[in-house]
Amino acid sequence: MNRTLAQILGLTLVCGLLLISTTSCDSSSQEQSKRYRLIHNNDGSDALLNRWFGGEPVHKADIDSYMVAQTPDGKTQVTTFMMCSGSDFIYYPDSKYGRYFGDDLNGTLPYADSAIKKLWQLGGQSVRNLQAEGTDVIKASLERAKMHGMETFISFRMNDLHFADTASGNRATFPDFWFEHPEYWTHDTTQGWHSGQAFDFSYPEVRQHKLNLIKEQLEKYDMIDGYELDFMRFIVLFKTGEGREKAPLITEMVRETKQTIDSLSAVRGHKILLAVRVPVTVDGAIDKGLDVKQWADEGLIDFVTIGVHWRGDTGIPVAQFRKDFGHNEIPVYASIDDGGYLPREFYSDGMYRGMA
């Protein structure tokens, strides 16, 4: 049985992020977020596929209506709204570095799966509708969030592996840079789903490609209060066992991103925050190439979110992470992911409360 795109993506990544540390957060751009944050991290597919309003190609009015439910006016306690920008796969904004979600070059790129074709073309028409109205899903969502007094972030998936499978035959879903450069893949299948065709960040070309996408977004969206590097989608950066040795390569990427952010902060006259999403232990993070302590030592990051991939974990070791991290001045948040069941079954309110 084919899984729909919505099932594969999980619709919304709900980082129902509960404050773990109430230590000072003077770098925050909003008074409320100095005390705590409740973050909604949305993966964007429910908006672009218009799951809220009948599944027809989306228009800006749909995004405006959709956003009401996400805001304090919609009776939520969410302080911070993050909109995912995608990754190489399922990239939402129009970009000079790749095709946007649903761009099959006017139907010239093949699909092997009719269900994927239908959803991909729906997403593409939604992108074009929004473009014709002078906006896109990121701009429309975050501007609306700002209108309601929310802190706004873009969340970028550092190495998303949805559709990273050439055997599927769905060429329309393959990013050109990824498809044309298999020499930049890990070719290591030991790390789970599609990991063998994941980008290997050992290659400077891969790192530069990612930095180009990040810088493009930072320059394009001037309404943001911050930017998140989501290393958990997916947590494959190097071949198995190479993370600790090659962690300085990722640190340099974080450093360059911070430099771009600081330059833009000076131009725009307000501080733009840099956040990261990483595994639930400091040791586990560096095993994957993520030296979170070094980033904090250098003053590169403003807050950290920890979590697992695609699971609702009731036992995230927040206190141990805080102890091992050693930076009490930097807030640490725990996340609740929206995934876990196939066929698709959402967690109940009680389950969310239990995980929290």
Q: Language-model features: where?
A:
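Active-site-adjacent "subsite" loops/lids of carbohydrate-active enzymes
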Residues: 33-61, 109-143, 153-216, 344-355
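Aromatic-lined carbohydrate-binding/catalytic grooves of carbohydrate-active enzymes
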Residues: 78-131, 306-308, 315-320
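Active-site neighborhood of glycoside hydrolase catalytic domains
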Residues: 205-330
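Acidic-and-aromatic substrate-binding clefts and catalytic sites of carbohydrate-active enzymes
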Residues: 48, 56-58, 86-91, 131, ...
